[in-house]
Amino acid sequence: MINYGVVGVGYFGAELARFMNMHDNAKITCVYDPENGENIARELQCINMSSLDALVSSKLVDCVIVATPNYLHKEPVIKAAKNKKHVFCEKPIALSYEDCVDMVKACKEAGVTFMAGHIMNFFNGVQYARKLIKEGVIGEILSCHTKRNGWENKQERLSWKKMKEQSGGHLYHHIHELDCVQHLLGEIPETVTMIGGNLAHSGPGFGNEDDMLFMTLEFPSGKLATLEWGSAFNWPEHYVIINGTKGSIKIDMQETAGSLRIGGQTKHFLVHETQEEDDDRRKGNMTSEMDGAIAYGHPGKKTPLWLASLIRKETLFLHNILCGAKPEEDYIDLLNGEAAMSAIATADAATLSRSQDRKVKISEIIKHTSVM
């Protein structure tokens, strides 16, 4: 039996707890969340801890799941590691590369597992695209292009997710596509350029994050990538396109359909596990109160079918690893800190590029910091 404690049981943390509790030989023994802990503890019949220190030091906990707001990840991760607890940390791992390195280093020094919650790696469509790329089906990769955007109206109650200092804004909070590009290409960029701004979302009812971001990545191999995020787009789009010398792949999360195009012929594949899940996401994109690509949940809200399936898959992967399973090659970087650190390093380089209006080398971010 592996016992889990969860720090932060709002929208996503509560769902992580619910699905982990469903796996064989897995048990949520306690939670800590001053606002939401009591209700979730009652639901899961576990202990509502009175403090973070009480949870991370408890003998009832083998692994700590950290799902607090983004800016509060570092303390529970490091305290869990110092208490010899395995750690799962929801994305983005941190809001700075230095913090991310400190967290990964603490877990390595303690000899405990550290898993980055980059859930997009578990998409059926991403796994299939990775397989096609490795098999050379679309030839040599030339470029990637991603978009994750939509339109956001004024909110009666502002979430922490709209405050840049707490969420990191679209770049960090929606880091999935950046991590996905680096995962699919198998390398991190050499240089990063980003422009952006807040063009339409200032004043009452809005946070302080940029509502448009445009990033360009140049890789050591010569590959290129462009990425776009924002909440000031009245034509919502959400996709990843990989272009090769023989063909291309599109993982479209707005229309929820995967496509492989070679020689003018298109073959379709599932983005998620079943057609029902793809249909569920497509329908949700059309009916949600906010465009699907930029929508976010809140405590008390349950995840849609497609996301519930992903959480089940992700938590089962973690549980199997802690039970002694060996990870497949494509997932090793989720467990050794590489995915966590490389995504944040690129995001930090992009942030520096925008603030200083110049092209930034990744080496400027990572040269002074190492993980043993």
From Swiss-Prot:
GO biological process terms, semicolon-separated: DNA damage response; N-acetylneuraminate catabolic process
UniProt keywords, alphabetically: Lyase, NAD
GO MF annotation: an example: protein homodimerization activity
PANTHER family membership: BILIVERDIN REDUCTASE A
Family: Belongs to the Gfo/Idh/MocA family.
Other comments on record: Bell et al. show that this hydratase allows the growth of E.coli strain BW25113 on 2,7-AN as a sole carbon source. However, Kentache et al. show that it allows the growth of E.coli on 2,7-AN and 2,3-EN, which are produced during the degradation of sialoconjugates by sialidases from other bacteria, provided the repressor NanR has been inactivated.
Function recorded in the entry: Hydratase involved in the degradation of sialic acids. Catalyzes the reversible conversion of the dehydrated form of N-acetylneuraminate (Neu5Ac), 2,7-anhydro-N-acetylneuraminate (2,7-AN), to Neu5Ac. Also catalyzes the irreversible conversion of 2-deoxy-2,3-didehydro-N-acetylneuraminate (2,3-EN) to Neu5Ac. The reaction mechanism involves keto intermediates and the transient formation of NADH.
Name of the protein: 2,7-anhydro-N-acetylneuraminate hydratase
Source organism of the structure: Escherichia coli (strain K12)
